[in-house]
């Protein structure tokens, strides 16, 4: 039996291109994360009654499509390899459509509808392109250390991109707006710049993985031929809807990961929507917010340097690393809520917690890659791309829940910006700190009791899958 698992053909180059692609993609998505709402109301000056069209409808469509993107990736014909094809085409279409979002059309309703339509189209293409990116650790390598490294690079690339975007975005927007004498051209110019970077980053990665994808296509074709021969049915060579369902509902580790990620994203997204309220109303230190955000971004960047140290410390055990790191964060949420230390102490300790707890979450993508290997081993069908596409579902659902919770909480509080900020001190303290701790604790418990794939087991399954393919081709 072959004891060599599949590895990256050129690890060094793949690592660099994978990191660059994630960095460039995050740069573009930061436009939406930080500026789409303020652009709509303060720059495009779209009436409040129409704002829900571009801000809410795309989120709903995005969540629904998150269940279909993996199926589209699997079933849709493509002239090149499916990963190379979507990495090349997806960013181009997405960047063009997203740039149109920041063009101000004269009629308010027309502008809102066009924004909505372009966001939906852009999301469709960049979501599938992102699925191909998140699939790389699962598709291109079975070596658990390489998967962990790719997962770490994805997380680090996102953190660095967010930090860089925070430094350059507003100066570019203001400079272009001042030169053109408009409120919107700066947003459009910045989106074009981010889109070009996004296209370049993904094209570089597409060219890098093409050779590995060809190797994978040969292995998949051999396995499909074996399965079709065994079933005496050509249709058996394709991934069926039943096999897709089995890949999720029959995959305990994947179900646990999905639920864990949902509550992890809720822990991040829900307080993100209340950051301004928390600093203004609960802490009474609005001027300190930028220091807090920048400091945490920097901590996320430097956490990548602790990642290899943690790998050695935990002897490559991803689950133990994640649980230990998350326990640090959970403890800090509850300690701060009940002790109520001063603002500067909160900022400093939060930055340190982000630094020392950050490496744990950098393994998330590697967990999904392991669950994809488990699905292929258990069902015999190559459903890895489909499984990796499910990585985005908890994220989309968390965004949807955040929108509902944010509106519900503000309505329940009868929030009035004209009142004394301290009026809302306790409610926003609860939402930002204690609710985050509760979400994080639930995620921790799900991972502790629901996920049981060890690195040794994943390696053994990968070898068995490889042996099946070898046997089918002889």
Predicted regions, residues:
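Membrane-embedded alpha-helical bundles of multi-pass transporters/translocases
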Residues: 2-474
């Amino acid at each position: 039996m072959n004891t060599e698992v599949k590895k990256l053909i050129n690890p060094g180059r793949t690592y660099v291109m994978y990191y660059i692609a994630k960095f460039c993609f995050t740069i573009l998505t930061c436009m939406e994360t930080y500026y789409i709402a303020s652009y709509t109301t303060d720059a495009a000056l779209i009436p409040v009654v129409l704002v829900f069209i571009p801000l809410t409808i795309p989120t709903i469509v995005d969540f629904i499509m998150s269940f279909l993107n993996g199926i589209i990736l699997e079933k849709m014909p493509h002239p090149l390899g499916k990963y190379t094809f979507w990495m090349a085409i997806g960013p181009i279409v997405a960047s063009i459509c997203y740039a149109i979002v920041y063009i101000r059309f004269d009629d308010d309703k027309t502008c809102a509808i066009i924004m909505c339509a372009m966001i939906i189209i852009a999301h469709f293409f960049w979501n599938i392109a992102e699925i191909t990116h998140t699939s790389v650790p699962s598709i291109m390598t079975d070596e658990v250390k390489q998967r962990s490294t790719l997962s770490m690079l994805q997380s680090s690339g996102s953190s660095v991109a967010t930090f860089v975007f925070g430094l350059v975005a507003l100066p570019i927007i203001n400079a272009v707006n001042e030169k053109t004498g408009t409120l919107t051209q700066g947003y459009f110019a910045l989106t074009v710049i981010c889109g070009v970077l996004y296209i370049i980053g993904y094209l570089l990665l597409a060219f890098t993985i093409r050779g590995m994808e060809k190797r994978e296509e040969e292995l998949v074709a051999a396995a499909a031929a074996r399965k079709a021969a065994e079933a005496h049915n050509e249709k058996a060579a394709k991934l069926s809807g039943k096999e897709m369902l089995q890949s999720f509902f029959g995959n305990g580790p994947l179900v646990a990961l999905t639920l864990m990620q949902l509550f992890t994203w809720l822990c991040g997204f829900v307080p993100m929507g209340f950051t301004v309220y928390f600093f203004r109303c609960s802490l009474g230190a609005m001027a300190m917010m930028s220091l807090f955000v920048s400091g945490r971004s920097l901590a996320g960047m430097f956490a990548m340097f602790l990642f290899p140290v943690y790998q050695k410390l935990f002897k490559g055990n991803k689950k133990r690393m994640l649980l230990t790191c998350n326990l640090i964060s959970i403890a800090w949420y509850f300690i701060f809520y009940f002790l109520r230390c001063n603002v500067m102490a909160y900022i400093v300790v939060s930055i340190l917690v982000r630094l020392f707890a950050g490496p744990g979450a950098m393994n998330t993508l590697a967990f999904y890659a392991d669950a994809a290997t488990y699905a292929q081993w258990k069902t015999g069908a190559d459903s890895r791309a489909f499984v990796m596409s499910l990585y985005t579902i908890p994220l989309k659902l968390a965004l949807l829940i955040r929108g509902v919770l944010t509106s519900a909480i503000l309505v329940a509080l009868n929030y009035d910006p004209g009142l004394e900020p301290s009026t809302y001190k306790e409610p926003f303290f609860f939402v930002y700190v204690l609710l985050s701790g509760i979400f994080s604790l639930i995620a921790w418990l799900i991972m502790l009791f629901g996920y049981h794939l060890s690195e040794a087991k994943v390696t053994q399954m990968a070898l068995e899958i490889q042996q099946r393919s070898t046997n089918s081709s002889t």
